[in-house]
Amino acid sequence: MKKSKGLFYAGIVGIVVALVIGVAVIMMSKRSGGGNAATHDGTVKITCYGGSEKEDFINDPQVKKILREKYGVEVNFIAKGSYKQVQIPADELKANKVDCLWPSSASAQAVFEESGSSKAFGNDYQAASVLQSPEVLYANTEAAEGLKNAGIVQVRDNVYFIVDFRKLLEEYLLPGKSWADLAVAVPSGPVLINSSDPATSNSGMTLAQLELATTASGNPYQPASTAQAGASLAKVKALIEAQGLMRTGSNSAFEQWIIQQTGGLLAGYENQLLQWITTRNAGAVPAGIVTLYPEPTIFNDHPILTLTAAAKKLIAAIEDDAIQDIAWTRYGFRPGTRVLEQVFPGVTVPPTHTIKKTQAPGYAVIKLLLDCFVTNHC
């Protein structure tokens, strides 16, 4: 009898210990931040908000295979505008169990850090630029030729460069000139540069930064100071508002422009046309579309901002040579970790070292631009 009682109590103790261990494991998992749970094979699932132009890339079957088999990570990618994601309060990010942000520029990263949000994540916060893509303007061939005839665009080695962005802005856009003034029949109407909404999306904000540098500082290679920016915000706001309704993300803005064959000018990333060619157009270059490289342009970094320890795996994974190769050959992202030969089937792309570049403005100027676009405080 005593022996059976002993066994009974031992069983009870065993059950209690098992329950305590189970509860402890659950609590530790919850405290880990992003709510990332390991699958039966040990793979960690993380949730990441990122720019829409990276959605096809991160969901590429081969990329997902490398992430899972080599790095033990699976990504739930939720497309969200760069400036929208970095302005989400830290408490809300934690409540929604977000493990990382993946905006499309160092400017968006600066907003997250300078606002103090990054500090809320302590040592789990890490930032690393893993991909790059220069800001470009897309044009239909007739519009590009009209700009070339006006001395605004030059063609060198089969690549179109905007060599006089100031002339384009001050002699055509700001005065409200029409495409007919450039002897262009398609498109009709005023000369505009369309973009995604700069209040939420990085490609639109980068266009605004280029416009600001050109109109404010007098030297496009010199980012505008706060004083210069303040004096020119109204001009930039007018250029943006002239577009009318804007898409909230870079990807939807590009897809609308190319599918509807809108013509004219669209600001975006170099990779968007290259990605369209490989993933949507069976490797064929769409007829009648030209990529224009502003001189200078801004190279958009695509930094991963980790909010939990588990998300740090993603940085190492995207820096993997095999994934960097896929990023370029299938999705047109220039590598953020090493130098690759810039050769893309059917398209002439300028080598990185030959592209004339300028820097984005500092945080104070970015904040002025955001306040202007979001709250109309210009």
Outline where the language-model segments fall.
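N-terminal segment of the mature folded domain
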Residues: 36-188, 368-378
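Bilobed "Venus flytrap"/periplasmic-binding protein-like clamshell domains
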Residues: 53-59, 199-217
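Periplasmic-binding protein-like
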Residues: 127-137, 233-240, 281-312
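Short helix-loop capping/hinge motifs at secondary-structure junctions, enriched
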Residues: 143-148, 216-222, 309-313
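Bilobed periplasmic-binding protein/Venus flytrap-like ligand-binding cleft at the lobe interface
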Residues: 153-173, 192-199, 303-340
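Alpha-helix-centered segments that form part of catalytic cores
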Residues: 166-200, 232-248
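Ligand-binding pocket segment of bilobal, Venus flytrap-like solute-binding proteins
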Residues: 206-290
